[in-house]
Amino acid sequence: PLLNGATVVLAAPDQVRDPLALRSLITAAGVTGMQATPSLWHAVVADSEGELAWVRALVGGEALPGELARTLVSRTAAVTNLYGPTETTIWSTTAEVHADATGVSSIGRPIANTQVYIRDTALSPVPTGGPGELYIAGDGLARGYLDRPDLTAERFVADPFGVPGARMYRTGDLVRWSTTGQLE
């Protein structure tokens, strides 16, 4: 946000625990974008009537339920579903959420400088529509786990599609490419 001229507003712990107090902070500070988990968004938008109409909702950290997606679309300026494990600096893919959101949450496409692969157990590509494990590579990838060489070797594997020495993270998440080029 700061690189784009925005101001960062940090809510106090007591405000985060009180949806009404958090909505008041958003209004008073003129917040135009907020990142939160679906659980927190659910509490914040409950009983809200137009108070968040100018806020861009960034949703991540948990799966985005279809009902909440539709509620957010109707009560905020825009909704972006974010996906990414801590090992890849939390945002790896994004998807704009629209009013026709269904129960299947798209996690979208990779962000800049991020590559995603869907592979089977032999690390072979999976065809469009077929399920496979998600692997993530790119500039946001961590080097591994501190003092956990065995786990690092298991989860951070050689990236056969990158430059020599490149690694990719084995997420353990099952996904598929949709026919529209979105990860689901």
Regions found by a protein language model. Name each.
Residues L3-S106, N113-Q115, D120-P125, D150:
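Adenylate-forming
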